[in-house]
C-alpha cells in the first residue's frame, strides 16, 4: 500500500479525490513480473474486455463494474470464511444487489458487525484472514488504512481502504464498518449473484428490506432540506416501487431506527418535513442533476418521489381520510 495515503473521512468530495490520488499513485507501482511473460497482459486485457461488454449491456461506466467486481471477489471470500456470520451487509451495495447494478450504481461497501469488537485491530485481523482465502480468480487484496469515520456522528465506525489487484490492474476499495444498528426484526440471509454469471451465487447476511428502507427514510426526514445525497431519495423510491415489503414491519423498523439514532423527536413532524422537502428548490435542482447523471433515474420526476414518501409514511392515507365530502 503506497505510503503517504491516509483515509480522508470527512468530506465525500475529499474522499473521492483521495481514491483518485490513490489510483494515480498505484499506476506507478510495479508488481512482480509474471512467469508467463505476455500472458500477464492478456489476462488484464481479457478482464477489461469482459467488463466493457457488461458496461455496454447495462449502460454503466466500466469503472463501476470493475469496482463492484472487486467487491464481489472480497465478498465471495467473506462467504467462505469464519467471519461470514459476523459481517452484515447494508447500504448501496445491498440496494444494487436487490434492484440490479443497472438500476443502482455504487462504489462503496457498508457493513455492520455482529459479535465482533468494533476496533481497528479486530477489523484488520478479520479482513486479513478473509483476504488470505485463495480462489482461482487471480485477485489479491492489500489492507491499507483503517480510520475513524467522522462525517456523521450518528453512524460512527471505521473506514477501511484496501487495494484489489488483478494482474496489472489495481483498484482502490473503501469499506465502512459500524456496529449496533437496529435491524428490525432481524438480519436475513441473502443470495448475491455474481457479475459475470447470474447462476453463480454466494450467501451472506444482510439487512432485511424494511430496515434498508427505514434507514433511507429516516435519513431523508432527519436531513430534510439540508440533504446533499439524492441517492437517498432514489433508493427509497426504487425499493418502495419495485420490491415486496411489509408495511407494518417498515413502520416498526423506522421507529426503531429513529430511537437508535436518537432522532424520534427530530422527525416526528412528518407532514411538515415532507412539505418543506416538496417545496425546496435546491432539492429539486439537485434531483434534476442526479437524473441527468444516471440514466436509471432519468424517468423519475421529483413529484413521484414525494408521492411515494407520502404513501410510505401514511400522509396520503391521512389526507384521503380528512378530505371534505362534497355533494355530487
Feature annotation, model-predicted:
Residues 15-21, 31:
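Cationic, low-complexity basic patches in intrinsically disordered or flexible, solvent-exposed regions
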Residues 18, 25-26, 120, 244:
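Hydrophobic alpha-helical membrane context
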Amino acid at each position: 500500500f503506497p505510503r503517504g495515503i491516509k483515509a480522508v473521512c470527512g468530506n465525500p468530495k475529499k474522499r473521492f479525490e483521495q481514491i483518485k490520488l490513490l489510483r494515480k499513485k498505484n499506476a506507478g507501482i510495479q508488481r512482480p513480473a509474471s512467469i508467463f511473460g505476455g500472458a500477464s497482459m492478456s489476462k488484464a486485457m481479457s478482464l477489461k474486455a469482459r467488463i466493457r461488454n457488461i458496461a455496454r449491456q447495462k449502460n454503466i461506466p466500466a469503472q463501476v463494474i470493475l469496482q463492484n467486481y472487486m467487491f464481489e471477489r472480497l465478498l465471495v471470500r467473506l462467504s467462505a470464511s469464519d467471519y461470514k456470520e459476523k459481517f452484515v451487509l447494508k447500504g448501496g451495495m445491498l440496494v444494487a444487489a436487490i434492484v440490479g447494478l443497472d438500476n443502482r450504481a455504487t462504489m462503496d461497501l457498508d457493513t455492520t458487525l455482529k459479535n465482533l469488537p468494533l476496533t481497528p485491530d479486530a477489523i484488520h485481523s478479520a479482513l486479513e484472514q478473509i483476504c488470505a482465502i485463495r480462489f482461482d480468480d487471480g485477485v489479491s487484496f492489500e489492507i491499507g488504512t483503517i480510520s475513524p469515520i467522522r462525517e456523521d456522528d450518528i453512524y460512527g465506525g471505521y473506514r477501511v481502504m484496501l487495494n484489489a489487484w488483478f494482474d496489472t490492474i489495481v483498484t482502490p476499495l473503501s469499506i465502512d464498518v459500524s456496529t449496533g444498528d437496529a435491524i428490525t426484526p432481524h438480519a436475513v440471509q441473502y443470495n448475491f449473484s455474481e457479475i459475470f454469471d447470474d447462476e453463480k451465487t454466494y450467501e451472506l447476511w444482510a439487512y432485511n428490506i424494511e430496515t434498508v428502507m427505514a434507514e433511507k427514510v429516516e435519513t431523508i426526514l432527519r436531513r430534510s432540506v439540508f440533504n446533499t445525497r439524492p441517492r437517498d431519495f432514489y433508493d427509497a423510491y426504487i425499493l418502495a416501487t419495485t420490491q415486496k415489503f411489509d408495511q407494518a414491519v417498515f413502520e416498526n423498523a423506522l421507529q426503531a431506527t429513529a430511537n437508535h439514532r436518537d432522532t424520534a423527536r427530530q422527525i416526528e413532524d412528518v407532514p411538515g418535513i415532507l412539505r418543506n422537502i416538496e417545496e425546496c428548490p435546491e432539492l429539486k435542482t439537485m434531483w434534476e442533476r442526479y437524473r441527468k447523471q444516471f440514466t436509471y433515474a432519468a424517468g423519475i420526476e421529483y413529484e413521484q418521489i414525494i408521492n411515494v414518501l407520502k404513501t410510505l409514511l401514511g400522509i396520503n392515507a391521512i389526507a384521503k381520510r380528512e378530505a371534505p365530502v362534497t355533494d355530487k
